[in-house]
Amino acid sequence: MLTSFRLLALGAALAIGAANSIVVLAADKEQVIKDREALMKRQGSDLGAVRGYIEDKNDLAKATAGATDLIQTMQKIPDVFPPGTEGRDPDGKYAPKPEVWSDWKDFLAQRDTAAAKAEALLVAVKTGDKPNIQTAFADLGKNGCGACHAKFREEIKK
């Protein structure tokens, strides 16, 4: 009898804990989506710093800082896509496709590909050789970021 009571109490405690987790997730969902959009915009800014160097609009130090930060932000991508955070970004232009979560391993593999291409971009940036940087930049854009966005990001038509 006492064992049944303990199991019942344990079950109730687990149910309450699970319910509280769902409430926290619901409360945090909006913030996670905002954080996700901010991370993607930060990556865009990082790429802009590299593009600026290629186009003679800024110096190599800014391009290097951007390429370095891009590598760091790539590692944070899984953190801003936890389950239960489906939905449009705050500006309403994009939303992750359900495949982010249903094909999580492939999503992470795409991120790994993009991260490797970001590392190759940093190597190129450190040379200062603009044609080499342009090649690495284009590869990252098409086969890294672009490939992931093509498979896992939906543009919201207004």
Q: What name fits each language-model region?
A:
Residues 10-18:
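Hydrophobic helical h-region of N-terminal Sec-dependent signal peptides
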Residues 1-11:
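Bacterial N-terminal signal peptides that target proteins for export
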Residues 18-26:
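Sec/Tat signal peptide C-region and signal peptidase I cleavage site
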